[in-house]
């Protein structure tokens, strides 16, 4: 489904929080939305692989990577796993790599930067916790909508039809 965050903001301005414009699209799907699962990890993506093994239909993995630009938390292998398990997208407050491969995949991926250095894979981090970045506090279960214009967050799903 295509989402227009500008239109959604016009309709639901009282019900949405707008994430500061820090993010760029890296995936092949530039418009995506769904219920978020929050993760906090720093320069280690082992936990992301574990979570993306689950069925992701209608869900977005929202990763607080501390804004680190030293190691990429998402690469092509992780994105392919997410796509295989039907995730709608991945949002990373941090970096990605293998961007040419990422843009070929039909999944939404937004991050703040790209860098060629990969993350550790020890599985250090926490999931289903409150995270805060981009001027917004995110909780697992919230609903996120993203496109080339920006990202918005709502406690409840928005009526898009």
From Swiss-Prot:
Molecular-function GO term, any one: enzyme binding
Keywords: Cytoplasm
Gene3D superfamilies linked: Ribonuclease E inhibitor RraA/RraA-like
Entry keyword Cytoplasm: yes
Protein name: Regulator of ribonuclease activity A
InterPro entries associated with the record: RraA, RraA/RraA-like, RraA/RraA-like_sf, RraA_gpbac
Gene: rraA
Species, as recorded: Erwinia tasmaniensis (strain DSM 17950 / CFBP 7177 / CIP 109463 / NCPPB 4357 / Et1/99)
Key word Cytoplasm present: yes
Principal cellular location given in the protein's record: cytoplasm
Pfam families on file: RraA-like
């Amino acid at each position: 489904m295509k989402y227009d965050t500008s239109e959604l903001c016009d309709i639901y301005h009282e019900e949405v929080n707008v994430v500061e414009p820090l993010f760029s699209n890296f995936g092949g799907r530039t418009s995506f939305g769904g219920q978020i699962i929050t993760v906090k990890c720093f320069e280690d993506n082992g936990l992301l692989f574990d979570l993306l093994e689950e069925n992701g239909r209608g869900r977005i993995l929202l990763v607080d990577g501390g804004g680190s630009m030293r190691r990429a938390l998402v690469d092509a292998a992780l994105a392919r796993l997410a796509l295989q398990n039907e995730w709608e997208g991945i949002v990373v407050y941090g970096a990605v790599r293998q961007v040419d491969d990422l843009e070929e995949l039909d999944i939404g991926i937004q991050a703040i930067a790209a860098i060629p250095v990969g993350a550790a894979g020890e599985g250090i981090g926490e999931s289903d916790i409150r995270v805060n970045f981009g001027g917004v506090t995110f909780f697992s279960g919230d609903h996120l909508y993203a496109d080339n214009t920006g990202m918005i967050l709502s406690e409840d799903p928005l009526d898009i039809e």
